[in-house]
């Protein structure tokens, strides 16, 4: 992605919500490489899909020759961003936040190149400059540059202040001051001139721009990416089970892959622009191919493959595809013990059972059948498989060979209803 027309290319992909001064940014990028940053607060022990667009934007800028700084908010994470939140965040302990900081830094690392010469990425932590700052320094050197009148008129704050049941504490109110000082420090140490953030961060970004200009007289700029929504208006990045996480221990690669496979036709080509590095021409050609093929669209599989590889690597992608194929075909011979562990984590419904159980009880306990009577009829109708093998004996008791790796048995009713038994 060439630096000279980078903003135009981002706009073509729908990745630009606002730029604080588009003309100035275009001029600055035309002059040569720029240092830019994006902040990630440790509000959980993993990033989720909502973080992926700004994180990939950092990568896009680095590919164009610019220097990305990934800032993990070890200090701001102790406070919590109140922007557009209906209630105050729970305060976590320093030990918990530090643990989350370490995990998030490790998650960010594979997306950026930290050893590529002058535009090598930098990982920073704002606890480094806030950790030993006393309250007098904070109020005198930072607080005096912020207007309370302006802050309470920000839409993100007004929404909370106008609620009768929920106000805003001084702790949360100070978040904007903290974030403002982040950019001042990054501008001083790394000459950062551009911040990337979600469109819900616009008011924080403009405050940071004002503070940096006042303290350093430096012209800095902000670019926000859109908050992703689906074509039907519902929130992106959520499933019935909650958020889709980047940590494979919280959302398995299989579940992650399936999330993208299930993308609606109305969203898939837009998401290819947001979440992959395919060119616009390649995406348009794929869309045209899908329209004219007369078959099921290929785009969802391309999207799932590209994003799963980005987040979980080739090994994670191949495991996800292997599990998908085995569940579709009914043949489990290619699955490893680790694959079954993914299924147990979040791939299919799971039930724990004691050894010695019979098939009818397993169907009831797994909720594949409502009663033993109904289970008996379903088994007799040849609609149940155990590890891919048909079983029509209602009196069947599980055998040792049914316990794959000594731990797992996969039941299926019909073609699509699965449950994994994990033996105690």
Swiss-Prot record:
This is Tyrosine--tRNA ligase. Residues 357-414 form the S4 RNA-binding domain. It is found in: Cytoplasm. Its EC number is 6.1.1.1. Homodimer. HAMAP family: Tyr_tRNA_synth_type1. A motif ('HIGH' region) lies at residues 42-51. Its main location: cytoplasm. The gene is tyrS. One of its GO terms (cellular component) is cytosol. PROSITE patterns: AA_TRNA_LIGASE_I, S4.
């Amino acid at each position: 992605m060439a630096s000279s027309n980078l903003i135009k290319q981002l706009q073509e992909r729908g990745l630009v919500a606002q730029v604080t001064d588009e003309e100035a940014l275009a001029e600055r990028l035309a002059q040569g490489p720029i240092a830019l940053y994006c902040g990630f607060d440790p509000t959980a022990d993993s990033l989720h899909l909502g973080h992926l667009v700004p994180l990939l934007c950092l990568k896009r800028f680095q590919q164009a020759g610019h220097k990305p700084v990934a800032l993990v908010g070890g200090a701001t994470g102790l406070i919590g961003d109140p922007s557009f939140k209906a209630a105050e965040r729970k305060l976590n302990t320093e030990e918990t936040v530090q643990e989350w900081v370490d995990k998030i830094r490790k998650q960010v690392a594979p997306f950026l190149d930290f050893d590529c010469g002058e535009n090598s990425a930098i990982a920073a932590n704002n606890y480094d400059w806030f950790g030993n700052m006393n309250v007098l320094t904070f109020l005198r050197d930072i607080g005096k540059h912020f207007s309370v009148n302006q802050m309470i008129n920000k839409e993100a704050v007004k929404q909370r202040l106008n609620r009768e049941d929920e106000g805003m504490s001084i702790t949360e109110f100070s978040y904007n001051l903290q974030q403002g000082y982040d950019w001042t420090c990054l501008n001083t140490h790394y000459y950062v001139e551009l911040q990337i953030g979600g469109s819900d961060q616009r008011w924080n970004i403009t405050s940071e721009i004002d503070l940096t200009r006042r303290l350093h007289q430096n012209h800095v700029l902000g670019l926000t990416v859109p908050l992703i929504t689906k074509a039907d208006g519902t929130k992106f990045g959520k499933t019935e089970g909650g958020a889709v996480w980047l940590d494979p221990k919280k959302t398995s690669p299989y579940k992650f892959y399936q999330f993208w496979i299930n993308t609606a036709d109305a969203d898939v080509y837009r998401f290819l622009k947001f979440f992959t590095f395919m060119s616009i021409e390649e995406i348009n050609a794929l869309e045209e191919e899908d329209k004219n093929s007369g078959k099921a669209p290929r785009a969802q599989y391309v999207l799932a493959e590209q994003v799963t590889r980005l987040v979980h690597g080739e090994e994670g992608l191949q495991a996800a595809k292997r599990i998908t194929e085995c569940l579709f075909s009914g043949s489990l011979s290619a699955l490893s013990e680790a694959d079954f562990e993914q299924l147990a984590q979040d791939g299919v419904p799971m039930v724990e059972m004691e050894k010695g159980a019979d098939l009818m009880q397993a169907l009831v306990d797994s909720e594949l059948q409502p009663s033993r009577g109904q289970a008996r009829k379903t088994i007799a109708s040849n609609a149940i498989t155990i590890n891919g093998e048909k079983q029509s004996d209602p009196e069947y008791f599980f055998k040792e060979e049914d316990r794959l790796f000594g731990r797992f048995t996969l039941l299926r009713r019909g073609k699509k209803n699965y449950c994994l038994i994990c033996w105690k």
